[in-house]
Amino acid sequence: MTLTFLGASHGIPESHRRCSCTMVTIGERIYFVDMGVMAICDLTDRGLPVEAVKGIFITHMHGDHTNGLIHFADLISWYYTASDPEIFLPLLEGKEIIDSWIALSCHATRDLRYKQVADGSVFDDGFLKVNAVRTQHTKSSFSYRLEAEGKAVLFTGDLRRPDADFPKGLAKDADLIICEGAHFPATEYKPFLEEASPGRVIVNHYAPWNIPHIMELSKALPDLHITMATDGMEVEL
């Protein structure tokens, strides 16, 4: 399982930092957690077929996590028509908005496979298993645990605060925990990461003001190999 951070910025893009989008590659199959960038452009740059995308998992509906999804849905509706991923939305009303936007361009919309996210098991295609737990960042926001090839990765997604909604159950025995770093000092993760004791921690979606807190957290928990995600960074599990 290979993770590629296509965008690792917080709520707004910065120089050489785009909004949230992580590509997960398992063999020749591709999945995305959030799509705050025009991911088809990245696939094209890498010579990867759009048809290889099998699943898209949105943590919540804020634009910095979804703005690339309309572009993706538009292009697979009329051009990359062999692409048929399952698209998991925290709010299924988003489907109607995407379809309406595509219709404004006079392109016909396909019956894409949108799915409503709920607590528990949401996806299993025999290659990747995904479980979800609701968080308190918005009225409908989720953390995801991805399992493939004997490895487990937790994406916290955006949280209210760790003491309110850190997904302890999904963190158990995780090889990698990917934490957000935009809404509270990263040092607040300390007791929860100590308890989970993952093999590695990557702080993603972080704001500049939080970098000193991330560095402090890294010094406090050296065995967890805490690092910060950067655009284009690849991690092999």
Predicted regions located by residue number:
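Binuclear metal-ion centers of metallo-dependent hydrolases, dominated by the metallo-beta-lactamase
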Residues: 163-176, 185-237
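Short internal beta-strands
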Residues: 85-92, 178, 202-205
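Active-site metal-binding loops of divalent metal-dependent hydrolases
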Residues: 8-10, 36-38, 61, 135-137, ...
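Active-site metal-binding motif and surrounding structural segment of the metallo-beta-lactamase
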Residues: 38-88, 172-175
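Conserved beta-strand hairpin/beta-sheet module of binuclear metal-dependent hydrolase folds
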Residues: 1-46, 140-160, 176
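Metallo-beta-lactamase
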Residues: 82-140, 148, 226-234
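Structural motif
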Residues: 57, 153-155, 178, 202
